[in-house]
Amino acid sequence: MITDTFSRKSEYSTNKLRKRLRRLVGTAIADFNMIESGDRIMVCLSGGKDSYALLDILRNLQAHAPLDFELIAVNLDQKQPGFPEHVLPGYLSEINMPFRIVEQDTYSVVKRVIPEGKTTCSLCSRLRRGVLYRVATELGATKIALGHHRDDILETFFLNMFYGGKLKAMPPKLVSDDGCHVVIRPLAYCKEKDLAAYAQLVQFPIIPCNLCGSQPNLQRQVIKEMMQQWNKKYPGRLETMFTALQNIQLSHLADTSRYDFVGIKPHGIATEEGDKAFDEELLPDSPVGMNHDDAASELDEACSTEAVQGGTI
């Protein structure tokens, strides 16, 4: 009886989470015009939770959306020691997904250049990016899809602000630095914890990301922990911060290259949007980015935890 109840609850949670993730991906794709009819999309698959979820959701979209587009999964085997070469080909063959495994020994290059015990992620990423751009050209891909999510975007924003002195995040859609490809991030509106929960429920064959032995990026880890503490103490803060990235007012920053502060003159016309220079701005009591789904998600999580701790499941 307990097993049946748990099974039903698990199935309900999986379906609810799947629908939410699909809706968020669909919204991001529509907002940024990420996918167009006739696209050939190269989905970069690392074997981690995010790229698995990305491929899974895009396959569902391909089956049900009115747009006609192709998907091809690409994995870069960087020859890291212990990398399970059979996992991704087995999974992709099982789901009848066209794929290509690219073998390129970037691991040896990184180990030769970066001192032992240092973070190798930056160089590894640059080498991987170059290979993937080349493969995208060979495949005739019109878009390159990456599995970065909302938390990645916010982390990058704070990394650039705190350590780089720039207001710069990770765009949901951009032209690649070689100028030849359009890169999209369909998971831009998805929370990392939702993707982690989905991967666990669906049981993707996850490949560990630390096979290279690299030390963690300490700066990114500091930012990640800061965001986790904020979210725990002030629920909804991350949603509000992400909303802020979509609501930029250049006239209220201080970048003279982006806004003509030099040419400002009074125009004699009162506007509701005008700045009340001497007034403290009234802010809403509830976080701006918090919506019904976010609140429901928090409640579901709290109820599930309470049920488990209370022994009702």
From Swiss-Prot:
Motif, PP-loop motif: chain positions: 46-51
Cofactor requirement: Mg(2+); [4Fe-4S] cluster
CDD domains: TtcA-like
KW Transmembrane helix (keyword) present: no
EC number: 2.8.1.-
One annotated Gene Ontology cellular component of this protein: cytoplasm
Location within or outside the cell: Cytoplasm
InterPro entries: Rossmann-like_a/b/a_fold, TilS/TtcA_N, tRNA_Cyd_32_2_STrfase
Annotated cofactor note: Binds 1 [4Fe-4S] cluster per subunit. The cluster is chelated by three Cys residues, the fourth Fe has a free coordination site that may bind a sulfur atom transferred from the persulfide of IscS.
Ligand binding ([4Fe-4S] cluster): 121, 124, 212
Pathway: tRNA modification
Reaction(s) the record says it catalyses: cytidine(32) in tRNA + S-sulfanyl-L-cysteinyl-[cysteine desulfurase] + AH2 + ATP = 2-thiocytidine(32) in tRNA + L-cysteinyl-[cysteine desulfurase] + A + AMP + diphosphate + H(+)
One Gene Ontology term from the biological process aspect of the record: tRNA thio-modification
Function: Catalyzes the ATP-dependent 2-thiolation of cytidine in position 32 of tRNA, to form 2-thiocytidine (s(2)C32). The sulfur atoms are provided by the cysteine/cysteine desulfurase (IscS) system.
Protein name: tRNA-cytidine(32) 2-sulfurtransferase
Organism lineage: Bacteria, Pseudomonadati, Pseudomonadota, Betaproteobacteria, Nitrosomonadales
